[in-house]
Amino acid sequence: MAGNTIGQLFRVTTFGESHGIALGCIVDGVPPNLELSEKDIQPDLDRRKPGTSRYTTPRREDDEVQILSGVFEGKTTGTSIGMIIKNGDQRSQDYGDIKDRFRPGHADFTYQQKYGIRDYRGGGRSSARETAMRVAAGAIAKKYLREHFGIEVRGFLSQIGNIKIAPQKVGQIDWEKVNSNPFFCPDESAVEKFDELIRELKKEGDSIGAKLTVIAENVPVGLGEPVFDRLDADLAHALMGINAVKGVEIGDGFAVVEQRGSEHRDEMTPNGFESNHAGGILGGISSGQPIIATIALKPTSSITIPGRSINLNGEAVEVVTKGRHDPCVGIRAVPIAEAMVAIVLLDHLLRFKAQCK
């Protein structure tokens, strides 16, 4: 399995499985003399960790990160930063029934077909549990971006099922409100509707999809390496690598299909851009406007409603998922998406500095 690393100058490699001893990552390319401790990383992990509200999986993990290397006397040394998070609340016995069966909609079938073996306990490497280390690495990237470039990377939940929040304008979002409710939602009226929907889904044993938006503000002009390492292409690659993500939009995204050129083009005046339909990226290069990326996440297939599938012998079976799972994986995906955007931006900033200035 060779796809465990992302980035060129700022490189993140993760390892570990859902029910293994621990999760870990190696972060290369962090510039020296950045003040860093576990306290800088833990808040984002706490936003992502399971068991923090009645709307997410009841699996409880402290997700306490430990820095193993790359930091001396409270500052980064420029060497590889190693981090681990120990797993503590595994219930592997919950997955005995699917040892020889494939859960429909999961990676069970494809992992088995590709590798001839799979860790069926909680999905193993394919579990969203792995994303904890992405969040840890992303927290480092976010700190460096904020302190050295004034760049803020923040996200919010914009839709669950058919419930959409009111349109949000960049610069007018109440981020304290976003982080004060379990849905990471800036629209109070939508929070109540989300609550009602999730409660109903939990009674039914079903799940639902979601959409969330990440905004990066104060990104300078010039990030992106055409033609194959365009900034939007790398953002899409990183965001599509998140479990359950089935679609990525930059700026207006798929809505451009209904727009005319006279509407979509972001006209300019001596005072700046008149609009931001492009989401802060033109020709694969950042324009200096806020970068706006939206992702769609599928409803998790880990539900208690019986589903048809096959076993290792290709025979028809019925699968009922046990274990503890999220009724909507999009809720905890906000800090994960923020992390992936931050990782890409820092990588491109370092590449920009090396080549252009």
UniProtKB/Swiss-Prot annotation:
Q: What cellular-component terms does GO give this entry?
A: cytosol
Reactions it catalyzes: 5-O-(1-carboxyvinyl)-3-phosphoshikimate = chorismate + phosphate
Highest taxon in the source lineage: Bacteria
Tell me the route in metabolism or biology where this protein functions.
Metabolic intermediate biosynthesis; chorismate biosynthesis; chorismate from D-erythrose 4-phosphate and phosphoenolpyruvate: step 7/7
Instruction: Quote the record's binding site residues for NADP(+).
Output: R48, R54
GO BP annotations of the record are: amino acid biosynthetic process; aromatic amino acid family biosynthetic process; chorismate biosynthetic process
- Which GO molecular function, any one, fits this protein according to its record? FMN binding
Where do Basic and acidic residues bias regions lie? Answer: 37-49
Cofactor dependence is on:
FMNH2
What does this protein's record comment on cofactor binding? Reduced FMN (FMNH(2)).
Segments spanning the bilayer are none
Q: Which CDD domains match?
A: Chorismate_synthase (cd07304)
Q: Which EC number(s) does UniProt give?
A: 4.2.3.5
Q: Where is this region: Disordered?
A: 37-60
Binding-site residues, FMN: R125, S126, S127, N243, A244, G283, K298, P299, T300, S301, S302, R324
Which family does this protein fall into? Answer: Belongs to the chorismate synthase family.
Q: What does this protein do?
A: This reaction introduces a second double bond into the aromatic ring system.
Q: Return the protein name.
A: Chorismate synthase
UniProt organism field? Haemophilus influenzae (strain ATCC 51907 / DSM 11121 / KW20 / Rd)
Q: Which gene encodes it?
A: aroC
